[in-house]
């Protein structure tokens, strides 16, 4: 489906962007989040220049994204390591089971 125009209000300014209908709710939520961040930043920093606030917010969001990407990479690496360890454990168990079942007189059912 094609993108549709969506009107947003961010920090007292109107903005019209095109957005696929299935992403409209996520876009509105992102706009609300950005608006809240800008309001909070204005109160915390006492900066009144809107452009400066937007740049600070963008840097904060970029930093958070970088941190989340690092967490995801670390988690994926940890999972890969665990999978390799499980695979080795299973392979070792299968080898040992093969050795046991090859001994005369041992039967497993």
From Swiss-Prot:
GO terms for cellular component: cell division site; cell septum; cytosol; plasma membrane. Keywords: Cell cycle, Cell division, Coiled coil, Cytoplasm, Septation. The keyword Cell cycle applies. It is found in: Cytoplasm. Activator of cell division through the inhibition of FtsZ GTPase activity, therefore promoting FtsZ assembly into bundles of protofilaments necessary for the formation of the division Z ring. It is recruited early at mid-cell but it is not essential for cell division. Belongs to the ZapA family. Type 1 subfamily. This is Cell division protein ZapA. It comes from Klebsiella pneumoniae subsp. pneumoniae (strain ATCC 700721 / MGH 78578).
């Amino acid at each position: 489906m094609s993108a549709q125009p969506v009107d947003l209000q961010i920090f007292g300014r109107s903005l019209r962007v095109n957005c696929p209908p299935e992403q409209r709710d996520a876009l509105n939520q992102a706009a609300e989040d950005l608006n809240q961040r800008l309001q909070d930043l204005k109160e915390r920093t006492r900066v009144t220049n809107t452009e400066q606030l937007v740049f600070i917010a963008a840097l904060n969001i970029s930093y958070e994204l970088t941190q989340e990407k690092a967490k995801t990479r670390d988690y994926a690496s940890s999972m890969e390591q665990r999978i390799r360890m499980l695979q080795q454990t299973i392979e070792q168990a299968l080898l040992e089971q093969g050795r046991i079942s090859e001994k005369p007189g041992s039967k497993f059912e």
